[in-house]
Amino acid sequence: MKKLSSWGNTSNLNHETHTLFDADQAQSLIANNRNGIVYAMGRSYGDACLNPGGIALENTNLDRLLSLDEELGILECESGVTLKFLQEFLIPKGWMLPVSPGTQYVSVGGCIANDIHG
């Protein structure tokens, strides 16, 4: 068990955690357990990233860039990649994210899950 919290730190709850190393592992854990949620940077407002009574799949190790088409500006990455890493990687290549939240310490998966800036 590990205590996890969200950005507001209003709740600090015990979770059964599993560290992910690939997507197949996540599918197996969800199929063989009760409800689960992916947890990365813990910057969600409210408690959207928490799952007391279920499992938390920590995806910070899923932090690889898979491809970049520099001509089209299309990047494929794993869900644990942070916006900080993306900015450090893309800006020297002449690319920027079209929108950014108030922090760079969020994961791509968290941005998608929370619909950050549409």
Where are the language model's segments positioned?
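N-terminal regions that are enriched for targeting/export leaders
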Residues: M1-S6
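Glycine-rich N-terminal segment of FAD-binding domains in flavoprotein oxidoreductases
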Residues: G8-Y105, N114-H117
